[in-house]
Amino acid sequence: MESIGIVSPQTMHFSEPLRLQNGSSLANYDLVVETYGKLNAARSNAVLVCHALNASHHVAGVYADDPKNVGWWDNMVGPGKPLDTNRFFVIGVNNLGSCFGSTGPMSIDPSTGRPYGASFPVVTVEDWVNAQARVADEFGIEKFAAVMGGSLGGMQALAWSMMYPDRLEHCIVVASTPKLSAQNIAFNEVARSSILSDPDFHGGDYYAHGVKPKRGLRVARMIGHITYLSDDDMAAKFGRALRRAEGAEKAYNFNFDVEFEVESYLRYQGDKFADYFDANTYLLITRALDYFDPAKAYDGDLTAALAHTKAKYLIASFTTDWRFAPARSRELVKALLDHKRQVTYGEIDAPHGHDAFLLDDARYHNLMRAYYERIAAEVNA
């Protein structure tokens, strides 16, 4: 199927202070946005796509000056694709605290004239949703046809249905969870510790030193990447294959250089990530993941937390996702059904682990396509 083609981001400036959950406020901030498709006259065909940890507003298409930079969900969003831009007006928003153009630690603090660095406030999923709602206001969108996201993006979609129940018709939550488990928080803590202990971190103000804590970022990404893959997928891709020089006489080198293909792969992923991502952003986003727990205010009762929701839901999980296992999605489905909400649940048998939500799996995409057909019929009714 064809791509959406060449796209251009736009920066939206907001001067009305945004009150954050931690009690502080951002007086002025920018959000980078990309849109695809056309908003209809009734403004009823808009879909908000929320991004995960290392993604951004660049959901689909390519840039004229960087044709290799394909949108992170290009296989899902575009003409004739499951989220069909011939039918829907799709918005991607880069969240606060990111390193891809929206106001974050790398941005200049107007009160000091220097990058925010470690002084940038800790933000939450709820803060992001409030900021996204202001983007909707700027477009004159009173109600989204759907709010959609995978992983951390799914948490934002769920939060939308709880915080703004009258502003979305459908909520699509893919490979996500209503809260992190202790194990997931532990993975995030180990990743953050690798960054915080890097000598080049300088308390988060490494910009002034002209360095970047690449070693810490590299290890953080390696840890995270392991959790995004399934054991079966890693076995199929790498097994115990060795990275030997051609014609090598010995099976092992008997040192601590790269021996196995899986080691080489993780180091490559870590190096690539450390080149383009920001360490302070990584700390902020993983902490936002940790804090998301809408049931906390209801003594841990997820059913009670969802009492005021009104949306129709599509919840999708993947059998080999052990980061956010299907049991977590089923927990959400049960809580929604307790309120007799209209819920479609798909548990897709896919070998790729958590990252399956980003891949072009036929059963997964057929589910999404069928659901968006239903939404399109409602929009056009």
Curated annotation (Swiss-Prot):
One of its GO terms (cellular component) is cytoplasm. Substrate binds at R221, D355. InterPro entries: AB_hydrolase_1, AB_hydrolase_fold, HAT_MetX-like. It is found in: Cytoplasm. Its main location: cytoplasm. Keywords: Acyltransferase, Amino-acid biosynthesis, Cytoplasm, Methionine biosynthesis, Transferase. GO terms for biological process: homoserine metabolic process; methionine biosynthetic process. The keyword Cytoplasm applies. The active site is at S151 (nucleophile), D321, H354. One of its GO terms (molecular function) is homoserine O-succinyltransferase activity. Transfers a succinyl group from succinyl-CoA to L-homoserine, forming succinyl-L-homoserine. NCBIfam families: homoserO_Ac_trn, PRK00175.1. This is Homoserine O-succinyltransferase. The gene is metXS.
